[in-house]
Each structure stands twice: as C-alpha cells, then as structure tokens.
Amino acid sequence: AAENYAHNKGIKIEGFVGYGQENPPVCDLMLGKSRFAGVGCEVIAAYNYLKYEGFEPDMAKLAYDFEKNALIAADGSLGSNPRKISGLFKAMGVGYKRFYKVDEAQAAVEEGKPVIVSYHIGLNIFSGIHTVFAVKEEGRLYVYNCYNSAADKTEVESIYQLMNKNSLFIVGYTEDDSQMR
C-alpha cells in the first residue's frame, strides 16, 4: 500500500473525475497490484462524492485507505467492497445515509441529493460490479465514471437506466438529513 501511495501521489488528479476509469490520468493509479482502469470505481465514486460535499479529497490517500481497509482480494484484482465505503466515511467524519434499494437511490436524486450507487452488472454475484457517483445538475441527472471508457460525465434519465434487467443493486449512499442544502 505504501508503494502504491508513493506512485499514486505522483499522478495529478484535478477536479471531479467524470470520465471513465480507463482514461488518463486516473487509469494509471494503482489499487493493490491492479491499475485503476479495471478496479478503481469505488475509490472514484467516493472521491467525487467527497468533492461534491466540499471536502478536498486526496486521491492517493483515498486509494491507500481503500487498499488497507476495503479490498475484496488482497491483490486488488477484484476492486474494493462497496459496502465498506461507510466505514471509510465514518472514519473521516463524513455524514451519510446507506440504502439497499434502487428506489431509494432514485428518490434521493429526485430530492436533489448526490448518490453513490453500486450494482452487479449481471444476474449473479460473479458478474462483476460497478460503482458510480450521480447527481442532478440544473435539472439533469449526471453519472460520473458511468462506464469505463466514458469521455466525460454521462447524462441519464434515471438511476434505473444505469442497470439492465439483469443487474442486482448492492448498496448506495447519500447525504444524511443534517447535510441538506
């Protein structure tokens, strides 16, 4: 983790990461023995959420924290566990509300709240997962890192549009009521 932290510290990430994780410079960050290009979505979603909430997250430090506390496989090849985002937020003193249904994610964005959404891409738990940050901006819903090769944030009609009929919702996060704007 310390070696990756030193490597990641040398990669400058500015502003929100709206583009997909296969794009530079974020694709070259490391998580375990894996490049972010295939496994960094939870870290990117948490980074964007923190940025939106007014924090100044350090991507290298955030990746280090995920590597130490949230990897599914020790080598990072399976990314990180989206259910562990809550523990990282708690340790950082970040307020959040966790939910387990896509309807709750949709309701949160309709209320103007930012969300982190994690879901299985297919019908079984071995199909791979993706985790994204989504927020309404000027009445339009945008997803950051919507898919790995996205050139920028992606406009969608709803959270439901992210998932196909075979997708399984895993977990989501939004602001707790004390964070309302």
Residue ranges and their predicted role:
Residues 50-180:
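Conserved active-site-adjacent core of cysteine acyl-enzyme catalytic domains
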Residues 1, 9, 140, 180-181:
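Surface-exposed charge patches in extracellular/virion surface proteins
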Residues 1-74:
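Active-site-adjacent structural segments surrounding the nucleophilic cysteine of cysteine proteases
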